[in-house]
């Protein structure tokens, strides 16, 4: 059998409560990952019983790197902290409701992805029957995705990261970080591929997560909604498309203090000024029914240029 060699991967799992799902995700990742990886976990202020289990798993070397935040700073912040904590050729975000079910899962993804791994990003799809944009390899099936990918088990290589940067932290506690990243790649001409995950990964969330899922829907609606203070994601889509802000976005948070596993973040002053300008642009965007004319676009450009150059 041909030996398949995988690059070192920083697998980062952002965590916020969901005790059973989180433990299932982390246990399966450690037990079934044969390829070289660093398992990084960033806890977003979960309840004490889960934090205790995470510390135990770190002590037992199930987890390689653990960060426990003092409160919930959002999915993007947690992912970005884990991302920049490890020097690795590839970064992988795995949600804490994804369970690995195959020992060769990571090898299979990289083998199917092939040399495209250096010039594209990839994310999972389950039981996809679409005949278009499909290509089969000896190691699995891939699909060329037109715009967006699932962020549930999402891989980005260093070359792409150097151009596009980190996840956007514009969207609050739960946002459109994966869709936003895909859009930035789209506007940079970077290809996106879906890999068939049905034999590799499964979701472990259930009916008891109804309250959590309702919270996610509410957060999504705020990011895309049409009310006066809603629609940051829709605005960013417009700004990227019209080159009014850069594709490598500014980070909201930086580390304030770190004591052992415990981390406190703070908002960067530069980001605070930038976000005020972004909210001003959001007001203009919504007042124009999301169809800004040339004069309104110029006001947006000037507002963003005052805080720094966020255009390409």
Language-model region placement:
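N-proximal low-complexity "stem/linker" segments adjacent to membrane-targeting elements
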Residues: 1-28
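Short, acidic, metal-binding catalytic loop of nucleotide-sugar glycosyltransferases
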Residues: 27-36
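A conserved acidic beta->alpha catalytic loop
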Residues: 43-52
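Glycine-rich, basic loop-to-helix element that forms the pyrophosphate-binding segment
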Residues: 69-86
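A recurrent flexible, glycine/aromatic-enriched loop bordering the glycosyltransferase active site
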Residues: 76, 139-159, 174
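Short aromatic/hydrophobic "clamp" motif used to bind/position activated sugar donors
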Residues: 91
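Conserved donor NDP-sugar-binding/catalytic core segment of glycosyltransferases
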Residues: 103-135
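C-terminal catalytic/acceptor-binding lobe
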Residues: 173-311
């Amino acid at each position: 059998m041909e030996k398949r060699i995988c690059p070192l991967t920083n697998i980062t799992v952002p965590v916020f409560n969901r005790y059973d799902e989180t433990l299932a995700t982390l246990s399966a990742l450690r037990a079934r990952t044969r390829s070289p990886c660093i398992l990084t976990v960033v806890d977003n202020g979960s309840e004490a019983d889960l934090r205790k289990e995470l510390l135990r798993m770190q002590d037992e070397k199930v987890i390689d790197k653990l960060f426990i935040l003092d409160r919930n700073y959002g999915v993007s912040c947690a992912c970005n902290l884990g991302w920049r904590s490890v020097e690795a050729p590839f970064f992988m975000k795995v949600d804490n409701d994804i369970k690995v079910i195959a020992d060769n899962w990571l090898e299979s993804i990289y083998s199917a992805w092939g040399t495209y791994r250096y010039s594209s990003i990839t994310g999972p799809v389950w039981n996809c029957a679409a005949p278009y944009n499909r290509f089969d390899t000896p190691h699995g099936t891939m699909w060329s995705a037109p715009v967006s990918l699932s962020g549930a088990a999402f891989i980005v290589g260093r070359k792409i990261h150097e151009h596009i940067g980190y996840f956007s932290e514009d969207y609050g506690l739960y946002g459109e970080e994966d869709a936003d990243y895909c859009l930035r790649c789209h506007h940079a001409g970077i290809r996106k591929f879906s890999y068939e995950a049905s034999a590799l990964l499964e979701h472990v969330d259930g009916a008891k997560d109804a309250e959590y899922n309702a919270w996610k829907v509410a957060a999504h609606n705020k990011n895309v909604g049409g009310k006066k203070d809603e629609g940051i994601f829709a605005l960013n889509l417009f700004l990227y498309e019209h080159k009014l802000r850069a594709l490598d976005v500014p980070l909201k948070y930086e580390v304030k203090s770190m004591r052992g596993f415990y981390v406190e973040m703070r908002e960067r002053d530069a980001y605070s000024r930038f976000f005020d300008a972004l909210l001003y642009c959001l007001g203009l965007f919504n007042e124009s029914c999301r169809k800004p004319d040339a004069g309104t676009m110029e006001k947006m450009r000037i507002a963003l240029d005052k805080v720094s150059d966020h255009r390409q």
